[in-house]
Amino acid sequence: MQSLSQLGPSEIFLVARREKPSTRAQLWFTGRLSFRQETNGIRLKNRVEFSPRPVPPNLIAAEKEEAKAVLTLFFKKQGLSNSLSSRLINKSDLFIDHLVSRLHSVHKARYLVGRELTTLEIRDSLIPYLEQLHEEHGDLLAELVVSFPDPPAEPRLVASSPVSVLPPRGDTDSAADTRKLRAVSRVSELDTEGALRPQTLYLLDLGLNLEQIKTITRKFAAFPYYSLDGKIKPVVEFLLDLGIPKSDIPTILCKRPQICGISLTDNLKPTMAFLETLGIDKNQWAKIISRFPAILTYSRQKLTSTVEFLSQTGLTEEQIGRILTRCPNIMSYSVEDKLRPTMEYFRSLNVDVAVLLHRCPQTFGLSIESNLKPVTEFFLEKGFGLDEIGIMISRYGALYTFSLKENVMPKWDYFQTMDYPKSELVKFPQFFGYSLQERIKPRYELVQRSGVRLLLNQVLSLSGIEFEKVVKKKMMKLVSNNVIAEQSSGGLL
């Protein structure tokens, strides 16, 4: 006799129950299955041991949504498109039930004492299992998931009809819409006394409106099933204790509702402590979380890989800490797909990547093809050399964050009318960061009327008062020089 946790993935598919579990009344179970070998094959005999503790239906629903999210993420990592992943998930109800049952089996002790699993714990439990299945079944995994608990079709069938396991698009879209509508309708459901659910009332009190809660649910269907006292309220109170204003809570939940599925003691607080060891200023947590709450939902492996990359560029620990504090969303960038290619591109322009990262880390979130290359090509067309462009980027990394059409080009056109050589832009690329209508034009026109000459950075970088002082001083000097010149010419006569 073997327990479910001792069986390999292939054996689990053989011993899986063929009937769909009830979603109305479910109990905690150990999931132990026994079987014996007979002459005509494997005969199964289920022995399910129940605990008297019932599984709340809303918890089952939430765990199913979490399992779907993990499976979708896994499919995407295997190279499947968003639409194909969604179609597979919509046809995999029995496999999703199996994943939830596996969670109950692996974490039996947690469930017996009534402790819910966090989002990260669910992910950490299911990803290795899915990787093991993929290692065994390879390209058949998609069909295996859809056909569960039946074994997948023979490889030749998949080769001849690669999408035969998928339902018609209309059916999958309808199923997805139905589940989404069910979750959204839960937000505004009334009890027998005509009151909204406690979760909804609590969120309304925080400042969200019903439409915002429904929007969150459309993005993350597990959210309305989260326990108020077990998940939502403890996280919100913790955020408030950090100094985050109550008015910022709705924005945080809209940005990252998954944060409510994270255990404070097992995940959230340890993640914060770990980030502090990487240099994040612990006194800035309120600002960091308000700006980018997703940073608390990333695995330690992802956080570490990003920091290791930053270190490889030549940044010091102190500089890395400042970057993470000022621009925490850099943690969302993939090292291999985003950060490293961007680093290589800037190095091809002879840019000091460490300096650029420290000054303007958000530049590394831009698309090379859509944002970086067009700006580089624009300046090359205008006669700047690669070395000059590299100097401009190093001095003003934000240059590449501006819209080429709406910002850079109009300002370049106006610069052509100004009495400055191109070299002034190499010295002072910050020119592109000032407002054309409110700063550049008014100040340059004043300089022209005054008849004085200033460096480009003097025209734009000085405060209003200092700018006026410099212009007046230059004018007085100009008048004084003219008087002296007139006197000198008169003496000669």
Curated annotation (Swiss-Prot):
Assembly: Interacts with pTAC6.
Keywords: Chloroplast, DNA-binding, Plastid, Transcription, Transcription regulation, Transcription termination, Transit peptide
GO molecular function: sequence-specific double-stranded DNA binding
Annotated transit peptide: 1-43
Classification via InterPro entries: MTERF, MTERF_sf
Chain's role: Transcription termination factor required for processing and steady-state levels of plastid transcripts. Involved also in chloroplast transcriptional pausing, a general feature of chloroplast genes. Specifically and positively regulates the transcription of chloroplast psbEFLJ encoding for photosystem II (PSII) core subunits psbE, psbF, psbL and psbJ; causes the plastid-encoded RNA polymerase (PEP) complex to pause at psbEFLJ by binding to the +30 to +51 region of double-stranded DNA, and recruits additional pTAC6 to the transcriptionally paused region of psbEFLJ.
Subcellular location: Plastid, Chloroplast
Tissue specificity field: Expressed in roots, rosette leaves, cauline leaves, stems, flower buds and open flowers.
UniProt protein name: Transcription termination factor MTERF5, chloroplastic
A Gene Ontology biological process term: chloroplast organization
Any one annotated GO CC term: chloroplast
Phenotype of null mutants: Pale-green phenotype, reduced growth and altered structure of chloroplasts. Defect in photosystem II (PSII) function with strongly reduced levels of core subunits, including psbE, psbF, psbL and psbJ cotranscribed from psbEFLJ. Enhanced osmotic stress tolerance and altered sugar responses during seedling establishment.
Family: Belongs to the mTERF family.
Matching PANTHER family: CGI-12 PROTEIN-RELATED (PTHR13068), TRANSCRIPTION TERMINATION FACTOR MTERF5, CHLOROPLASTIC (PTHR13068:SF9)
